[in-house]
């Protein structure tokens, strides 16, 4: 009887499902305080997404000053500065993207144009939450 119990326990121990990592939803997103700063890699998106729904439910407009962030709350306003040039703009978070090592934000085509990111496609940025 003891041997059977041990076999059953051992058989069940290896069948645990792996946790699934998903981007935060609107209810568990982080509401950063004004002045919060983050640095990392930025990229941009637009063609292929224009007119589609964002994670917040808004229709994506590649010509609006918006961005996707992994876990900052929708509606958060962020000053984005391209460190290579010092160019900056303010965007509103309205979308999510999968967590990628080093990447902190995906900006719309309009924001990328203002920052000078269209050509290089990616660049190091400083994010600062603004009121």
Describe these PLM feature segments.
Residues 2-131:
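Secreted/periplasmic proteins
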